[in-house]
């Protein structure tokens, strides 16, 4: 049987980073990836017409220091997300133009939204992102959903609806599905609500010219034969002295294991002996967001001619969030849209033809008749992905953080955990994935060093 010091499971940014860090420390390591590619929830494809389609995660922004440093180290070029012109809010059949992260067309709604952003960020900054369960009111915050909080506020209906749309876009899940404590942790992890929803000086500021997946591709090139694709892990036999990792094509013995995949997928691996009941409860109570991401390609970015940025929020239709996805090196115009949360779940049950027709109808309502005749259409339903089962990130149901949260990053014997869901900073983002991989590698390295000293 093949043997190594460490087996890493999952070839996304967390697993790739952990593997590279261990290699740098002189530790033998093998990375097992279930797919035929690396990148996890980043997936960049250049289509036949030359259009770069970012099916998965794509943006980076200020304070995401680890991913920005890695992009620079790997020699990747970036460009700024297009944001010139006015954003658009479609509400109650009316088009309202505005600048900035928050719609300003309705003064009452704008004032309420500012208050809401301040309130949520203020509450979030009280959370210790390394231990949300230690907040003095953690149980109370964890007992309610985001929807419960929204309904309890005195904001106008328009502001409440926009906050719901924001929730679906960020997580993406229904406000009634997410613990308020989880939402506050998430906002704290990203530095505040406004920093997470904006473009300029915010999380959606920058894109990688060759696509975000190229970060993973270049990391993979450094691993050589330590990377094994098409190797879904089905069982981990573990003891105090090590583990045997069984995948579909063989088995590998290791001293330590890093499981760098979402909790939902980690819970589908068979463990012998089984995980404790409480650890299994944690994976049972984590769920992935639901999103179907679409790219609609036009001969030119015609919306710019009327002074629009391409960033739209809508209270109607399946596509309720859009951005200008056009590449500066290309002449075509591209709108990227998101069918989030329950809208995404509904959309995946439609036929491809009906779904495409509804997307185009949504864009016609938002951008006018010029949107009726795209030259290409691409989509990806992340909830249908066997080795993701959703995106952008795993979330906690009410009551989970306050009772089971301490187990999230706690090793189980020789098994360690990584992945953006375990990140303290920029949880759910590429930056968080990288940080989690670095942390897991350091944890494993320290454990192996202690074992050597004991010997």
Language-model segments: which ranges?
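Active-site/ligand-binding neighborhood in enzyme catalytic cores
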Residues: 129-232, 239-243, 260, 270, ...
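Flavin (primarily FAD) binding-site architecture
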Residues: 259-278
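Conserved flavin/dinucleotide-binding core of flavoenzymes
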Residues: 4, 17, 25, 99, ...
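Short hydrophobic core segments
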Residues: 7-9, 32, 233, 251-264
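Dinucleotide-binding Rossmann-like beta1-alpha1 core, especially the glycine-rich loop
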Residues: 51-123
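N-terminal Rossmann-like FAD-binding beta1-loop-alpha1 element of flavoenzymes
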Residues: 4-31
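Glycine-rich FAD pyrophosphate-binding loop
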Residues: 23-48
């Amino acid at each position: 049987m093949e043997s190594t010091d460490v087996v890493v499971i999952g070839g996304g940014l967390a697993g790739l980073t952990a593997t590279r860090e261990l290699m740098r420390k002189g530790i033998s390591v093998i990375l097992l990836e279930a797919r035929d590619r690396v990148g996890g929830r980043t997936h960049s494809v250049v289509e036949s017409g030359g259009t770069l389609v970012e099916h998965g995660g794509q943006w980076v922004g200020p304070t995401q220091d680890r991913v920005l440093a890695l992009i620079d180290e790997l020699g990747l070029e970036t460009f700024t997300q297009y944001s010139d012109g006015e954003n658009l809010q479609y509400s109650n059949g009316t088009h309202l133009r505005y600048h900035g992260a928050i719609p300003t067309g309705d003064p009452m709604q704008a004032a309420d939204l500012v208050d809401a952003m301040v309130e949520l960020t203020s509450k979030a900054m009280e959370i210790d992102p390394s231990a949300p369960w230690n907040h003095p009111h953690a149980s109370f915050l964890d007992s309610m959903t985001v929807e419960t909080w929204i309904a309890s506020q005195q904001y106008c209906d328009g502001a409440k609806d926009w906050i719901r749309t924001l929730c679906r876009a960020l997580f993406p899940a229904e406000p009634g599905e997410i613990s308020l404590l989880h939402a506050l942790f998430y906002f704290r992890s990203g530095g505040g609500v406004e920093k997470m929803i904006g473009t300029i000086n915010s999380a959606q500021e920058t894109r990688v010219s060759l696509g975000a997946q190229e970060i993973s591709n270049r990391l993979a090139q450094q691993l050589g034969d330590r990377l094994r694709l098409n190797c879904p892990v089905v069982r981990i036999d573990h003891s105090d002295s090590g583990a045997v990792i069984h995948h579909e094509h063989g088995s590998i013995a290791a001293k330590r294991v890093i499981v760098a995949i979402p909790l939902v997928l980690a819970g589908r691996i068979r463990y012998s002996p089984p995980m404790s009941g409480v650890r299994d409860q944690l994976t049972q109570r984590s769920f992935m967001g639901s999103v179907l991401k679409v790219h609609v390609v036009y001969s030119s970015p015609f919306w710019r001619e009327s002074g629009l940025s391409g960033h739209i929020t809508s209270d109607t239709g399946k596509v309720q969030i859009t951005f200008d996805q056009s590449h500066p090196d290309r002449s075509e115009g591209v709108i990227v849209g998101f069918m989030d949360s329950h809208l995404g779940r509904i959309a995946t049950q439609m036929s491809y033809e009906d779904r495409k027709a509804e997307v185009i109808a949504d864009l016609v309502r938002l951008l006018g008749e010029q949107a009726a005749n795209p030259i290409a259409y691409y989509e990806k339903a992340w909830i249908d992905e066997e080795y993701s089962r959703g995106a952008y990130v795993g979330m906690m149901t009410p009551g989970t953080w306050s009772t089971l949260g301490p187990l999230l990053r706690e090793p189980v014997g020789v098994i360690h955990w990584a992945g953006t869901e375990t990140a303290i900073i920029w949880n759910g983002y590429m930056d968080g994935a990288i940080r989690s991989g670095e942390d897991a590698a350091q944890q494993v390295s320290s454990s192996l060093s202690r074992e050597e000293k004991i010997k």
